[in-house]
Each structure stands twice: as structure tokens, then as C-alpha cells.
Amino acid sequence: MEFKYNGKVESIELNKYSKTLTQDPTQPATQAMHYGIGFKDEDFKKAQVGIVSMDWDGNPCNMHLGTLGSKIKNSVNQTDGLIGLQFHTIGVSDGIANGKLGMRYSLVSREVIADSIETNAGAEYYDAIVAVPGCDKNMPGSIIGMARLNRPSIMVYGGTIEHGEYKGEKLNIVSAFEALGQKITGNISEEDYHGVICNAIPGQGACGGMYTANTLASAIETLGMSLPYSASNPAVSQEKEDECDEIGLAIKNLLEKDIKPSDIMTKEAFENAITIVMVLGGSTNAVLHIIAMANAIGVEITQDDFQRISDVTPVLGDFKPSGKYMMEDLHKIGGVPAVLKYLLKEGKLHGDCLTVTGKTLAENVETALDLDFDSQDIIRPLENPIKATGHLQILYGNLAEGGSVAKISGKEGEFFKGTARVFDGEQHFIDGIESGRLHAGDVAVIRNIGPVGGPGMPEMLKPTSALIGAGLGKSCALITDGRFSGGTHGFVVGHIVPEAVEGGLIGLVEDDDIIEIDAVNNSISLKVADDEIARRRANYQKPAPKATRGVLAKFAKLTRPASEGCVTDL
């Protein structure tokens, strides 16, 4: 790949940060430490590139990132004037943690990742950053950390997993979650239940549908912070290896031209990112994370920007969880660049936004494949969309005065009026499924699991999957002050602000109340008289904090509401 910059090129020191340590004659101990890690005399004038991966053995999404990081380091070291230094930060496997209290740490991990990247690179004076994320919160955490530093940076996505298979049926992580509901209702044998679990995840790579990881990778490539094809190159592919081999030249180009995240992550670039999320039918988590990434670079993006773009952007991608296809299928027809090329042709994107190649978004995709709408139905044309407007809708009303996020594919309808069934937490809901407490026409209300009340705003993938598996996915709705996995589908509303423990009306809902959700008029309302609401509020007792020490308590104290991205950056 060729790299270029259309702006004015000025002479610049590539090591303008690291020279603070390597060239200062009053820092002999610093320089001795560098000799200790193997530096030669000639290395002290090189620009230092920090290569951070979220590699660890315990998650298929992340188990290969160390290998990719080593390839990137080799690419950097083979590039004249650069030296690569690897470091690592943490991750949380949403697929493993979902359904248990450990899921409270997932969103928190985004902030820990951002803080640790900023901390390490800031302390070590790295001149540039390459981040290698895999699982969901890894991506926004990486971008937030790089945005705070505002030094030349590139994100290399770890890549998507291949599909699993059992008895001729293609499987993915959500297949395993939904098998629970089938088991509870007696709709799957023990043998097949075990068979699904054993075969859903065949190896390394992020969960394969248009779930949160692939959604965020697509958004960040469109934003301009990854090389073209990074989002759709599979974890196990020659293309992903080739991408790693290109990073040395790519990051040197950014250093030479002093192209920083602030040059790339503009308001228009974020609008492009939101557009691709809508077109691909992406995760509700994109709302939280794009708002947070924009905040880190000083660009104001709100929930209302999502609604504005949703109103004029159709869903074209037929991807799981609500559709048929996986990210590996998009890769076969040209990946994200093919979709971007089509959208640019149709006037749906800002083509003049700068990217990490030094080229504009439009220049990046000039040679991408053209989508053939006769030979594939993974991506539909604008004139034949899956849904005429975006699937992510921002709803307001007395249940969500600060807003909420609905994921409405259109397959489940756009209006739901039903009877409330209240659950104080995730396990309470699962118990309700097992006891037959939920029936067609009900609105499940799961509360006290928001950013403060959770704390950590855990995902409700286990409940929504159990609902689908139990055969209630098309006849029940679910609302929560928590959030959803990218694997969630059905009539669901999350991110309700204010959350229950912050005085939100969701904390006052009782069984048999009537709740109305209108995705056409963007409203969510509790149909209870004002005097009855006042009576309940007078008698309300706020639950005691679930965490009083440690990182969860810290998050609960610092976090902004979901409508502001749950950022903790003061």
C-alpha cells in the first residue's frame, strides 16, 4: 500500500518525544536503562513506536494478538529510523463474563485500557502508538488512549473469527447463548446442547457477526484510524499478516507528516463512522463508544447525532444477530472498503476526511471492489434496503428523560405496548424465564444495572438470548438501564437515562404497569398517573451501593451517564 499526505510537508524530528529521554545528557540513568534492553548507539536517535496489544491466553478474541504485535514490531524495526517497543494492557472477554457479575468489569475495562495506554506511552515518551485490540472494549479503549496522547497512531484490529459448525448448521457465540433458552424450554436435547457449545467457537478471532467488536472495527476503519481492510481481514488470514507487515511504513509516514489523531478524528469523520454502523446494522454499544472516543479528542458527538444520521441512513447489511451473514462473508466480497466505495458513490459519506494512510477516505477505496448486487445479498443496494432508516433509534419519554437506545431491525415491528414484568438484575430475569413468569405481550424491565447501579452497566446478552431461545423474542420486549451485547436482537431498549439508582422512573415501575415503546415517534412511556408516580417516588428507597472499594466503586463515582458515553475522563 502507498502512503501519502495532501497537506504541506514540513521538516520534523521523528523522535521529538523520545529525544527528551534519549538525547538529554542529564539523563544518564535513562540511557543506561535503554542499553539494558538492548539498544545500540544508533538506536538512540530513532523514533520509538509503542506497540500495545491486549494479548492474553484466556479469550479467543485476544489469544493471537501477541503474535500480531510481534509481526508489527518486526515491521517497525525493519523501517529506517524507527524502533518498536512492545507493551501490554488488559482485556475482558465479554463472551466469557456475560451472564455473571464479572460482566460489570467489561465497560470498566475500556477506561483501564485507555488509562494504561496513556500512562505507559506518556511516561516512556513514545513518539507513536500502534494498538492491537481484539475484544469489544479493546477498540474504543485503544482509540481513547491514543486520542488523549494525540501522537501519530494506528489501530490494527485482531480480526474476526471463522464460523463454527454442528450437524451442518453454522454457529457463532450467540448460538451458545440462545441454546440456554432452548434448554430451559425443552427445545434442544442434551446431546445437541453440548454439541453447540463444543463447536460454536473454532479458534482465534473476535465474535463473527456484526457484534460489538466487528461493529467498532468497521467504525474505526471508516473513522480513518485503521488501514483499509483492517476491520474485515480475518484473524487467521494472509491478509491480516500482510496488514501487520505494512505498519512500519505506515507509522513512519504519519511521523514524517506529523499526522495526529486530531487531524483524522473530526466531526465529519465521526459522522462517517456512525453512518457505517447504521448501514451494517451494528451494535448499540457503538453509541456509547463513539461518543466516548469523540469526547477524548474534543469533538462533540451526542445521541441526537445518531438519530439524525439514522433518519437518513438505511440498513443494508444482512448480518447476524438479526440477519444471515458473518464478517467473514463481507471479507469475501471486498470488505468494508467495498461498502465505503458504494456509499461514497451514493453521496452518503464525507470522502475528503484524512486517514492513517495519509490519503483521504475516498482515495483509500478507489481501487476497492465494486459491490455486485446480482451475485450477493450480503449488502443490499439503497433502493432495496433491509430497513429504510437506521436500526438504532434514540427514544425519549417519561421512562427516559435523558434518552435511551433502541435496536429495531424492523423484523420485530416498530411499536410495542405491553405489561411490565420487573426484574431487579439479570439473575432475577433468568429465574423468571425458568419459572414461566414471562408471557407473550410482556415488557421485561431489568433495572439497577446501569453505570452506577451495576456498577459498570453490564450487557444483557444472556437475558435476551434466553428470551429468544424460549420462543418469546417476537412477542416480548425488554428494556433496561443496562446495555446490550452486539449479539442481542429482538425488541430491546437499553441505556435508559436516568438509570434507576439516579432517580430514573424505571426504578418505580411495578408489575402490570403498561409500557409503550414507539420507535416511529421515538418515545418510551410508562402509562401510570402522575399522582401514583409521585406516591411511589415518595416511598422509594435507593439500593445500597454494590461496590464500595476498588475499580468498580471508582467507576461508579466517576462515570458520566450512558447518554454521555460513560466516560470517566474528568
UniProtKB/Swiss-Prot annotation:
Its Enzyme Commission number(s) read 4.2.1.9
- Is the Magnesium keyword given for this protein? yes
Q: Which residues carry this modification: N6-carboxylysine?
A: K137
> Where on this chain does [2Fe-2S] cluster bind?
C61, C135, C207
Q: Does the record bear Iron in its keywords?
A: yes
Pathway the protein acts in = Amino-acid biosynthesis; L-isoleucine biosynthesis; L-isoleucine from 2-oxobutanoate: step 3/4; Amino-acid biosynthesis; L-valine biosynthesis; L-valine from pyruvate: step 3/4
Active site: residue positions: S485
Task: Write down the NCBIfam families for this protein, in alphabetical order.
Answer: ilvD, PRK00911.1
* Role of this protein: Functions in the biosynthesis of branched-chain amino acids. Catalyzes the dehydration of (2R,3R)-2,3-dihydroxy-3-methylpentanoate (2,3-dihydroxy-3-methylvalerate) into 2-oxo-3-methylpentanoate (2-oxo-3-methylvalerate) and of (2R)-2,3-dihydroxy-3-methylbutanoate (2,3-dihydroxyisovalerate) into 2-oxo-3-methylbutanoate (2-oxoisovalerate), the penultimate precursor to L-isoleucine and L-valine, respectively.
Protein name, UniProt field: Dihydroxy-acid dehydratase
Instruction: State the organism named in the record.
Output: Lactococcus lactis subsp. cremoris (strain SK11)
The gene coding this protein: ilvD
